[in-house]
Amino acid sequence: SFTHYVNRFRIEEAIRLLSDPNNETPMKAISAELGFNSISTFYNLFQSSVGMTPSQYRNKVMELQKEQ
């Protein structure tokens, strides 16, 4: 469906933004930038799609960058 397509695009864009270790944009701003009405909707959709919250994902990226 169209909604599924849009949400998949939003999550892919969130992953791209959160994968940049230099991006310190607050989650609330990322959520709003991607068109979510609430940060909880963003967190829930991200977690159901990726298997972790956006914050956990960002922290994991940071840890992996430090190891390199």
Annotate each language-model stretch with its function:
Residues 25-29, 39-40, 55:
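Residues within helix-turn-helix
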Residues 48-49, 60:
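Alpha-helical DNA-recognition elements
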Residues 1-34, 60-68:
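Terminal helix-turn-helix DNA-binding modules in bacterial transcription factors
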Residues 41-42, 46:
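Short hydrophobic/aromatic patch on the recognition helix
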